């Protein structure tokens, strides 16, 4: 597609050592980008860029399917998922597939089906990617105008945005349908230690749903990460799906207003930077969610949260010492505070010791022992159930600590047990990737703004050292 400006004026050109390493239409002369700059060569070749994106989707889905089958092949039903380094099966189990009361896996066949379906899908996507990258039309504008676009066409860009929003909304509603009609989802709060159940009484009150967004991110507030019942989670997906679909329809039907046309940079690289910024935010939120939230990420599958493991240890030793005759209500610890129980700054009865910092933890194995003023002494003396003892002992010994220095009082194992919690893996990976995406957002936003302002000239090539070197070939 011919454009009105020279590509060289807008994009800094990296000089190839060997100008012959290129395919027609994708070489440095016609695109202004060398081979290693990847999809930048395809900025104005919508057909080839489609191929790159479809092939990328194929790689993603292939990883999902292959890793899914790998986890199924290695899965041992007798051990908890979090002891086996699994990250995909816990997601499937949370959706209610293959599990029963207490999070026990009763059928691995749904996991196998999931892996195979993803592999088959990846083959279709892979074929489409190769077809559009190598055989399909270089540009879509002439043959398929609906799928064609010009990056500067603000109306077309917001139409594409609208289509994406509708697809995201449909995705949110798929979870709602699963929870309501197709077998339900796993609820860690179900009585007696968790079970799969259909969610019947959705929370649709905007005050509750949007109240999460208005909460402080700190302490006992915890912003949206503090959500602790499935009715709110599924109701939130109803709201989110509706907003995405309505917003998508809005963006398809309307053109950007004048203030939006002025405020944004309208180029391919600008859209890339916006997308990277959004993905970065997703990564940081996912990091906090998997680290702190034991409702959307049930501890039966992902292992306990850090605060949960710490509170579980305090509970385990309270149970032990109470059996040995300790009066847990009045015993003093080495600091003069309560050894087993103390009061929070606001007067609730909480666990004593170093775990006091986690006093606002909520967990399904602990909540039955709370009364109106925090932990209830009479319940701690008479009502502790065997499943609560078993679960807390299990969680105490599976803290997601890795090699953190501050362990919240958890007695760590010096003989290096080979255990890293999936919460540790998922939280750290999403934080690191979220950070990298943020850096990419800054990088591409800076380049896009410079190009729009007209002062992106690239490096002065006249004195480039490589020009005086012998060519590689």
UniProtKB/Swiss-Prot annotation:
NCBIfam families: psbC. Keywords: Acetylation, Chlorophyll, Chloroplast, Chromophore, Manganese, Membrane, Metal-binding, Phosphoprotein, Photosynthesis, Photosystem II, Plastid, Thylakoid, Transmembrane, Transmembrane helix. Residues 1-14 form a propeptide. The gene is psbC. The keyword Membrane applies. The modification Phosphothreonine is found at residue 15. Pfam families: PSII. This is Photosystem II CP43 reaction center protein. SUPFAM superfamilies: Photosystem II antenna protein-like. Belongs to the PsbB/PsbC family. PsbC subfamily. It comes from Calycanthus floridus var. glaucus. It is a multi-pass membrane protein. One of the components of the core complex of photosystem II (PSII). It binds chlorophyll and helps catalyze the primary light-induced photochemical processes of PSII. PSII is a light-driven water:plastoquinone oxidoreductase, using light energy to abstract electrons from H(2)O, generating O(2) and a proton gradient subsequently used for ATP formation. GO terms for cellular component: chloroplast thylakoid membrane; photosystem II. GO terms for molecular function: chlorophyll binding; electron transporter, transferring electrons within the cyclic electron transport pathway of photosynthesis activity; metal ion binding. It is found in: Plastid, Chloroplast thylakoid membrane. [CaMn4O5] cluster binds at residue 367. The modification N-acetylthreonine is found at residue 15. GO terms for biological process: photosynthetic electron transport in photosystem II.
